[in-house]
From Swiss-Prot:
Protein name as catalogued: Late expression factor 7
Function: Involved in late/very late gene activation.
The entry's keywords: Transcription, Transcription regulation
Domain of life assignment: Viruses
Length: 211
C-alpha cells in the first residue's frame, strides 16, 4: 500500500513527491557536508551510511552543505587526495580549543584513519596539525620517542591533559624516573594514548618521559 499523500496546510492540495535520486548521487551530494554534520546525517561507516540513505527523512538535509570549504583548505596546504587525514584536517583546525579538537578527533575520525594520522601521517597534513595544535605536535614527538625507545605502539585515540599554551614539544625527550628529580617541574603533562597514561615532566629545555 502506498503511503498517503502529503497536503499543503493552507490549500490542502497534494504536494508533489520528492524525486528519488540514485543512492550514489545522494551520497555524493551529502559528501560535501561539513564532516561533523555529514556524520550526524548519514553515519560514519559504509553500512550505516547505506541504511541512512534509505531513510527519506535523512535526505531532506542534503542542501545543508558548504561545497568547497574543506577542499579549498586541503588544496591550499597541498594535502594529497589519498591522505586519510584530508577529510578531517579542516575541521580539526577550525576547532576553537584543544579539548574540542581532541573530542572531534576521538569521536568523529574513524579508527583506521586516526591510526594513520597519529602513527604514519603524510607530511603535509601532519605539518598543518602540528602548526595549529601544540598537543598534536607533542603527541607525535612522544610516539617517535616511544618507538625509538622500544615501546612502539599504534594508538588511535589521544587525550592531552594540559594547558595548550604550556605544552612544548620541540625540546629533546628522554626517559627518567620520578625519583631522579629533587625540584618541581615547570609543567606536568599527562598523555592518554588509547588506555595508556603517560606522564611527561617539563624542565627547562627538556621533556622527561616518566618510566
Amino acid at each position: 500500500m502506498e503511503p498517503p499523500l502529503k497536503r499543503c496546510r493552507l490549500c490542502h492540495q497534494a504536494l508533489p513527491k520528492l524525486p528519488q535520486l540514485p543512492f550514489e548521487m545522494i551520497d555524493k551530494i551529502l559528501s560535501h557536508l561539513p564532516f561533523d554534520l555529514h556524520v550526524d546525517v548519514v553515519g560514519a561507516s559504509a553500512a550505516t551510511r547505506l541504511r541512512a540513505l534509505r531513510r527519506p527523512d535523512r535526505l531532506t538535509r542534503y542542501h545543508e552543505y558548504d561545497l568547497a570549504a574543506d577542499e579549498l583548505f586541503a588544496a591550499h596546504w597541498n594535502i594529497e587526495a589519498a591522505d586519510p587525514a584530508r577529510p578531517y584536517v579542516g575541521q580539526l583546525c577550525r576547532s576553537t580549543c584543544a579539548s574540542a579538537a581532541q573530542k572531534f578527533f576521538n569521536e568523529r575520525v574513524p579508527r583506521a584513519a586516526a591510526m594513520c594520522m597519529l602513527n604514519a601521517p603524510r607530511a603535509e597534513s601532519d605539518s598543518v596539525l602540528t602548526r595549529r595544535w601544540n598537543w598534536w605536535g607533542l603527541t607525535r614527538t612522544l610516539l617517535i620517542h616511544e618507538a625509538n625507545s622500544g615501546r612502539g605502539r599504534r594508538p588511535a585515540r589521544v587525550r592531552v591533559d594540559a594547558d595548550e599554551a604550556c605544552i612544548g614539544y620541540h625540546a629533546p625527550f628522554c626517559d627518567a624516573s620520578v625519583f631522579e628529580f629533587n625540584a618541581q617541574p615547570d609543567h606536568v603533562v599527562f598523555v592518554l594514548l588509547d588506555d595508556d597514561k603517560i606522564e611527561l615532566n617539563m624542565y627547562g629545555k627538556r621533556v622527561y618521559r616518566i618510566v
